[in-house]
Regions:
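C-terminal substrate-recognition "lid" of short-chain dehydrogenase/reductases
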Residues: 148-175
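Conserved Rossmann-fold SDR core element
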Residues: 97, 106-121, 168-175
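Short beta-loop-alpha junction of Rossmann-like oxidoreductase domains
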Residues: 35, 119-129
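Catalytic Tyr-x(3-8)-Lys segment
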Residues: 133-154
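Catalytic loop of short-chain dehydrogenase/reductase
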Residues: 45-49, 55-59, 70-108, 119-120
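Substrate-binding pocket helix/loop in short-chain dehydrogenase/reductase
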Residues: 36-37, 44-46, 136, 140
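Rossmann-fold cofactor-recognition segment
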Residues: 1-10
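Conserved NAD(P)H cofactor-binding loop of Rossmann-fold oxidoreductase domains
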Residues: 26-35, 177-178
């Protein structure tokens, strides 16, 4: 794995120009802010879009990938199940999924797919008080058909699937424990 600053056009272009083509590129980096449209400052909204959408766009645009290889974007369940306090995040995720479908056409024979995770127990949530985080996970698990929140391995398996299946392109795979139907 290689870490790149997805906000740095020059670093991204320099990296891919100096690299041999990749078999697979996964773009999961982002920093977004939640909040209602009325409450989220426009500067924070623009920074979120710059990070998650335009960051993925930059990498997908510059990435050198072998024919038959893949690019996988990571969106999120809010594109399918919006929240009044996460409107922007839902819109960004929907935009990423549309970008993935369009890139599948443009970049063919490179395959492009999107994985859309639900609530996943990652370090992202470690900033919450322990009792609040555990309560949120328990409430979510109760309403999910899978009866649990996701683990990073659940998303890794989905990314591996779309990366290695030669017939998967232009698809969005939702891995949310049934959250979009619950």
């Amino acid at each position: 794995p290689t870490a790149l600053d997805i906000l740095d056009d020059a670093a991204i272009e320099t990296f891919f120009a100096a690299s041999d083509p990749f078999d697979h590129v996964v773009i999961a980096a982002s920093a977004t802010k939640g909040g209602s449209v009325a409450q989220l400052p426009l500067a924070a909204a623009k920074a979120s879009m710059e990070s998650k959408f335009w960051g993925a766009y930059r990498v997908a645009r510059a990435a050198k990938v072998v024919d038959g290889g893949s690019i996988t974007l990571v969106s999120g369940f809010l594109s399918h199940r919006p929240s009044a306090t996460s409107v922007l995040q839902g819109a960004i995720n929907a935009a990423l999924e549309a970008l993935g479908r369009g890139l599948a056409l443009e970049r063919a024979p490179v395959r492009v797919n999107t994985v859309s995770p639900g609530l996943i127990d990652t370090p992202l949530w470690r900033g919450m008080p322990d009792t609040d985080r555990k309560a949120m996970f328990a409430r979510t698990a109760e309403r999910l058909p899978a009866r649990r929140v996701g683990q990073p391995e659940d998303i890794a398996q989905a990314i591996l699937f779309v990366s290695t299946n030669p017939f998967a392109t232009g698809s969005t795979i939702t891995v949310d424990g049934g959250g979009t139907i619950a």
